[in-house]
Amino acid sequence: MNRFLLRHPLVRTLVELRGNTRACVYTEPMWGLSMNLCLPYASVFMLSFGMSDVQVGIIASIYMFSQTVFAFLSGAIVDRYGRRFSTAFFDFLAWSVPCLIWASSQGFWFFAVAALFNGMMKITTVAWDCLLVEDAPRDKITHIYSWVIIAA
């Protein structure tokens, strides 16, 4: 069984990963699982503050709009500040700051500001994707993305 597994191209890719690619793939479950477990309850959390369905929809729209703006700017920002720094810094701004705002939230405007900050995750996404594939062998990129999808 062990020999069979090690001959499988996906398993072989996972074992042979090095550098930034290995760090990105190996740590993906820590992010993917936690976000997929808690984000669906964000709207329920907002409703518990007495917000209406329309207000929750506006917050979701603000979040989507800020993602669009930051996606447009992300390439220039990542090139300017580098992939690792951009990943670390904007990950903090996109997730830690909104979590602190959500935890101390008093209503609609708190959630709106948190949604604006949370949209910065597009910068992190671009930087992380660059880290994931920049040193990876071209023939392994499909397998690497397969592991990311499996992990999250």
Give the residues covered by each predicted segment:
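Helix-loop boundary and gating motifs at the non-cytosolic
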Residues: 6-66
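Hydrophobic core of transmembrane alpha-helices in multi-pass small-molecule transporters
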Residues: 29, 98, 109-124
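MFS transmembrane alpha-helix packing/gate-lining sites
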Residues: 63-70, 121, 151
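Helix-to-loop junctions at the C-terminal end of transmembrane segments
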Residues: 70-83
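Helix-breaking motifs and short loop linkers at transmembrane-helix boundaries and internal kinks
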Residues: 82, 104-106
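Structural signature of the two symmetry-related core transmembrane helices
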Residues: 85-100
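Intracellular juxtamembrane helix-capping segments at the cytosolic ends
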Residues: 123-136
